[in-house]
Amino acid sequence: MKVLMFGWEYPPHVFGGLATANFGISQGLHAQGDVDITLCLPHPFGDEDRSACKIVAMNSVPIAWRDVNHDYVQQRVGNIMNPDDYFRYRDHIYADFNYMHVNDLGCMDFAGGYPSNLHDEINNYSIIAGVVARSEEFDIIHAHDWLTFPAGIHAKRVSGKPLCIHVHATDFDRSRGKVNPTVYAIEKDGMDNADCIMCVSELTRQTVIHQYHQDPRKCFAMHNAVYPLKQEWQDIPRPNHKGKEKVVTFLGRLTMQK
């Protein structure tokens, strides 16, 4: 099976939980032995672990034709993407995007992470997804969280392939009810267009069903997992707390959601 995956971050450049989750599911799918993953990231740096997936640098995918040679493309983007892919993507530009702010390669730049113009970058990412979806071969689309839902929808409309969205958190979780209407609309649009909705917990699944009015039959709880501790860590002697004051460890962010 070939998976076209849309992510927003990936180790070692971790801005939030998405990077770790994206890495984990990529490694897990790759370990099955019969899954090939093409992972689209807005701004990879070139030092990402590519053992489990092919990484597409969305900031190096052209949306406007530029007459450049192979050596120049190699010089500009060779550290993050195969120059041959640049020319393959260039052959699948589907509209005149010269009115957009593009660089000398006809590509759009991304800040990486979560900049102040995040909604603009989400929209730009979805435009580029149309080029990638027309160029790659895949059987299913996997989109991580609301940031990539528009890209996943675009890829589905282009290809007709099923869309599986991965809900790591909803805006109800992040805001505890004070929902951003723009974010909510993007989330709901992604869910409405999805063929399968993966939720990280049963609580999230119930939120998706009741707050976003989704069919329970396409919503599944897919719990996050943890890596086994290294043996050297398991061998660390446990402290003796008998007779001492009880200690509670909280491992998480100090947010309403946690």
Q: What do these predicted regions represent?
A:
Residues L203, A225:
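Carbohydrate-associated surface elements
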Residues I141-H142, D192-E202:
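A short beta-strand/loop micro-motif in the catalytic core of glycosyltransferases
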Residues G130-S135, N180-I197:
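Membrane-proximal helix-turn-helix segments that form the acceptor-binding/catalytic region
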Residues M1-F15, C40-F45, M58-S60:
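Nucleotide-activated donor-dependent transferases that construct or modify glycoconjugates
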Residues V3, I140-H142, F149, I153-R174:
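Active-site proximal beta-strand in glycosyltransferases
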Residues N240-K258:
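Conserved donor-binding/catalytic core segment of Leloir-type glycosyltransferases
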Residues G28, D34-A133:
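A conserved catalytic-core segment of Leloir-type glycosyltransferases
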Residues E9-A21, R50, K258:
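A short, glycine/small-residue-rich beta-strand->loop->alpha-helix junction that serves as a flexible
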